[in-house]
Amino acid sequence: MQHETKMENQSWLKKLARRLGPGHVVNLCFIVVLLFSTLLTWREVVVLEDAYISSQRNHLENVANALDKHLQYNVDKLIFLRNGMREALVAPLDFTSLRDAVTEFEQHRDEHAWKIELNRRRTLPVNGVSDALVSEGNLLSRENESLDNEITAALEVGYLLRLAHNSSSMVEQAMYVSRAGFYVSTQPTLFTRNVPTRYYGYVTQPWFIGHSQRENRHRAVRWFTSQPEHASNTEPQVTVSVPVDSNNYWYGVLGMSIPVRTMQQFLRNAIDKNLDGEYQLYDSKLRFLTSSNPDHPTGNIFDPRELALLAQAMEHDTRGGIRMDSRYVSWERLDHFDGVLVRVHTLSEGVRGDFGSISIALTLLWALFTTMLLISWYVIRRMVSNMYVLQSSLQWQAWHDTLTRLYNRGALFEKARPLAKLCQTHQHPFSVIQVDLDHFKAINDRFGHQAGDRVLSHAAGLISSSLRAQDVAGRVGGEEFCVILPGASLTEAAEVAERIRLKLNEKEMLIAKSTTIRISASLGVSSSEETGDYDFEQLQSLADRRLYLAKQAGRNRVFASDNA
C-alpha cells in the first residue's frame, strides 16, 4: 500500500512538472516581482496619503485655532459683561445721576418711545418703549421688584460696552436687551421714533427668544445665525448671546453681532498665502456662512448629498476628513463657536503642491519600473519559450522515429521497463507484441525506398489506431514494430494482435499512379502470465521467436504460443 502511494505521488509530481514548464516558472517569478513592487509602491502611497491628510488637518487646525482665539476673546467679554450686570443688579451704585435716571424712567415709562441719557462721552443711552407695548409681548414683563436696579445696571453696562467696543474688533454691535421694554446698544438710535421698531426687532430674534428658561435650561452662551431676507439690504450676521439672570429671574439678554464679512476677512488674513485650498465656515446646521475665496465665495458649496455625508461624518468626531470625488474635505468643530470650519482641497491644487509632485514622481517611477519589468519579461519569456520549443523538438526527435512518429527502440525500452515494474508491483499481466511486415524488402526493391517509407508510415498509423489508450508502440528496426500492453493478458494481447493483422491486410494503399498494394504482417505475442517473468527483454525475445514461427508457418498470422 505504501509503495502504491509513493508511485501515485511520483506520478502526480511528474504531471505537475510537465504543467509547470519553464514559461510558467518565468511568468510566476515576474508576477511575484511585480506584485511585491506594486505592494511596496502602494505602501509608499499609503504613507504619503497619511502625511497629506495630516498636513491638511494641521493647516486647518492652525486657522481654526486663530479663529477660535478671536471668538473666545469676544465670548470672554460677554461673560465679563454678564457678571458685571449681575453685580449691578444685586448692588447698584449709589450715584445721584443713576437715581435721577430711575426718576426719569418713572416719568417717561408710559410714553410710546423714550430715551434716558446721562453722559454721551462716558455711557450709552437706554432706549425703551411704553408699558402698554411691553404688555403685548409674551416674553416681556415689567413686573419685577428690581426694575429700578435693572435700569441703573443697564446704564453701568452701557459704560462697559462703550469701553469694550472698538473698531479693531470683529464685533459690529454689542447690546443688552431687557424683557422690561428697553435696550442698550453700541449702535445709536438716531431718532426716538425708531426705538419701538428696533426693540421689537431685537426681541423677535432667535438669539433673544432662544434664551427663555425653557429654551436654554443651562443658561449657557449660544450662537445664532441670521440670514437676510431677499428684499432686505442687510447682510448675514452671527450673534453670540447669553441670558442675564439673578435670583432665578430672567432679566434680558447680552449679545454681540459679528457680520459674516468680517469673519471672511479674518479667514483670509489667517491663511498662509503660499497654501492652496478654500476655507469655509458653517453654522451648527451646516448652513454656509462664508468662504476664504474672495473671487468665488460659493465656488465649492456642497450639494445636499455631500452635506449629508459630511453631517454623518461629523456625528462621530469633532474633527476629521472625507474624500468627495476629486476633493479632500477636512473639518474641525470650533470650541467657542457653534459651527464648523471646513477646508476644501481640490485635485488640481493637490497636484500643484509638494505632495502632488511626490505622487507624480512615485507614479512615474512605478510606471517606469513596471514597463522595464514587462519588457524584460517579454524578452526572457520569448527566449525561454523558443528554448523550450527547441528542447521539446530535440527531445521528441531523440525519443521518436521521424518516419512513423512512433517511439524509437531506445525510447520504447525506457518506457517498457517502468511499466513492467509497475505491473509486477500490482500483480497485473504484462504482454508484448512483435510485428514484422511481410515481403517488405520486395516492396523496396520493386517500388523504391519512397514507397517503402509510405508503407512503414501507413502501417504505423494502422497499428496506433488498433491500440488501447494505455498501450505503447514503437519501431524497433527496419520493418519491425513492437507493442507493449500493460495490464493485458495473453488472450487479450492476442486479440489486439489479430486486430492489427486484419487492419493491415484489409486496406490497400496507393504506391504510385494506378498502383495499389495490400500488405500483411506476421505477429508474435508473449505475456508475463506464461512464466511470471516481467523482464521486458525476455518477453520481447519470446514474442520475436513466435513472430518468426508465424513467418515460417506461411506469414500473415498471429502466434501467441510456440505451438500455435
Swiss-Prot record:
EC identifiers of the protein: 2.7.7.65
GO molecular function (one): metal ion binding
Active site, per annotation: E479
Disruption phenotype: Deletion of the gene increases swimming motility and early biofilm formation. Disruption partially suppresses the reduced motility of a pdeH disruption; concomitant disruption of dosC, dgcE, dgcQ and dgcN completely restores motility, suggesting these 4 genes, together with the c-di-GMP phosphodiesterase PdeH, form a network that regulates cell motility by altering levels of c-di-GMP.
This protein's UniProt keywords: Cell inner membrane, Cell membrane, Cellulose biosynthesis, GTP-binding, Magnesium, Membrane, Metal-binding, Nucleotide-binding, Transferase, Transmembrane, Transmembrane helix
Pathway(s) served: Glycan metabolism; bacterial cellulose biosynthesis; Purine metabolism; 3',5'-cyclic di-GMP biosynthesis
Residues annotated as domain GGDEF: 428-563
Entry-linked InterPro entries: CHASE7 (IPR033416), Diguanylate_Cyclase (IPR050469), GGDEF_dom (IPR000160), Nucleotide_cyclase (IPR029787), Rev_trsase/Diguanyl_cyclase (IPR043128)
Segments traversing the membrane: 20-40, 360-380
UniProt subunit comment: Homodimer.
Protein name (record): Probable diguanylate cyclase DgcQ
Species for this entry: Escherichia coli (strain K12)
High-level lineage: Bacteria, Pseudomonadati, Pseudomonadota, Gammaproteobacteria, Enterobacterales
